[in-house]
């Protein structure tokens, strides 16, 4: 699961996918 934009999030995730606040 991710946000509208794929960029660096605030979370420990291998793949930066989210709207900034990580929704992985």
From Swiss-Prot:
Task: Name its co-factor(s).
Answer: a divalent metal cation
Q: In which pathway does this enzyme or protein participate? A: Aromatic compound metabolism; phenylpropanoid biosynthesis
Q: Which GO terms describe its molecular function?
A: caffeoyl-CoA O-methyltransferase activity; metal ion binding
* Miscellaneous remark of the record: On the 2D-gel the determined pI of this protein is: 5.2, its MW is: 30 kDa.
- What is this protein's function? Methylates caffeoyl-CoA to feruloyl-CoA and 5-hydroxyferuloyl-CoA to sinapoyl-CoA. Plays a role in the synthesis of feruloylated polysaccharides. Involved in the reinforcement of the plant cell wall. Also involved in the responding to wounding or pathogen challenge by the increased formation of cell wall-bound ferulic acid polymers.
Q: What protein name is recorded for this chain? A: Probable caffeoyl-CoA O-methyltransferase
EC number per UniProt: 2.1.1.104
